[in-house]
Amino acid sequence: MRVSGVVSGGVRVSARRLALVTAPRTGEAFESWVDRMARVNRCPPAEVATMMGLGLRGASADVRPPLFGVRSDDVVRRSVFAATGVSDERVDAMHLSVFEGGPLSVSAVLAAGRARRPSEGREWAAVHGSRACPCCLLVSGGVWQLWWKLSCAAVCPEHRVVLLDRCPSCGWVLRWGGERPRVVPAQWVRPPTCCANSVRGRPCSQWLPAVRVSRADGGTVEAQRRWLDVACGRVRPGLGGVEVAAGEWFAALRACVILLRLGLPRVLGRLPDVPGWCARVLLEERVERGAHGGRFGWGPASARAAASFLTVVMPL
């Protein structure tokens, strides 16, 4: 069975029925699902994406299309259904657009992609790249959660550990692609539990469940849980005892993060019960963001920074 797919580089590609299909998991990122499909079909993820009728190239070979993993459309849904039998609702649930109107503005992320600007800081989400919980990867067999791509993803509420930002072996941001960033690898199968970033033409072999990560502070875990409840629409947020829309609540959170950055270090002495580790991380992050003009409004630079902001700002 074939169905007309996404236009890529002026060429319309067609979806083909895949021999083996694995079902998406709850909360899984679209890219993660493509990786797992590639593994069971024993071919590179880019080949699976092509068979699913997805266009992976942007305006040129080194430009990644801004839509992939951010938002699906009718063409993508039809192509994916023809190739896998997965429903429109499940396809939509694997895209960052599920966070629209809350922690994310999809239109802003897409605009950043078209302008070739990094979105991981400016728009508070990483389109290409992700944080991860090594414990979750081990238990799930390599399912990467969609919310790990958000800049305020700090700790795993289930395993109570700080999320991993970078591979300790190659040093690259997880799932970024390494020296030759692409949407998904075109030359090798990317094991879902391994780094597999490109390093000198070969995939990094670091097995991520073996990486040691820090235990998370109890208060930070609770702050992350509350943040996730709002981000996923499970609770109605409030400000000053008044219920507000999720977009307003996240706008207030962003404003608090920016004001906290601008007020460092003096503001720390005026806030009650700030843990010492939070103060150290916040000061380090301020130096990193302040080293480049205009980045004070960007999202937390690391999982540890996100943990610090959640710990300090959420009680406010």
Q: What are these model-derived regions, one by one?
A:
Residues 1-316:
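Basic, alpha-helical nucleic-acid-binding regions used in initiation and control of genome expression
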